[in-house]
Amino acid sequence: GARIDGQAGVVLDVLTYYSNIEVVAFFDNRVVSKGATIQGIPIIGDIDKFSKFDNSKIDAIHVSIGDNKARYDIYKKLKPNGIPFISVIHPTAVISSSAKIGKGCFIGANATIQNNSIIGDYTIINTGTIVEHDNVIGDAVHMAPGSCTSGRVKIRDLAFLGVGSTVTPDVCIGKAAFVNAGTMVKKDIDDGITVAGYSSKIHFKNIYLDIEG
């Protein structure tokens, strides 16, 4: 993705802290004008044009899209190219030496990941998010700014935690579940369910319910 007012802009800003990393191109499935750039970096075109790009210029890939399913699908599409997926980590993030971070992740400013926690591939741990000890966070999860999990929480693949949401100890959040902003989750949530409010009331099954694999 190449939205400077979205996840791409956040990722690009973090990469300015790393003098050994140069962003050589963006790919974006939206229609963009010929010759378009972001801060002087060319937008080549949609992801289908990736195979035609000079891959000798690419050492690693990062997919900067906030939407879980879109991000996950693009990573799967790019995987056969054999180019490594890089995790982008803000220098102010605090990560325990015993935590494990998967490939293609984004860890935002002032995020905290505590001891023995595991973060799956392609997951976003956004600004100021707290992942407490002994958590298991799946692939392509998005924890929005200020969200917080207590100890021993499990979050399955493709789940989303909204801004300022909290999860109490030992809770499991199902695959592709959606937790609205400010919600406190005190009990397990099934796959594909959207919840909201202090008591995490079930509202409806969300749009990702049909995800397989």
Task: Report each predicted region and the residues it spans.
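Glycine-rich, N-terminal phosphate-binding loop of Rossmann-like dinucleotide-binding domains
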Residues: 2, 64-66, 109, 198
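Structural signal for interior beta-strand "rungs" in well-ordered beta-sheet cores
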Residues: 87-203
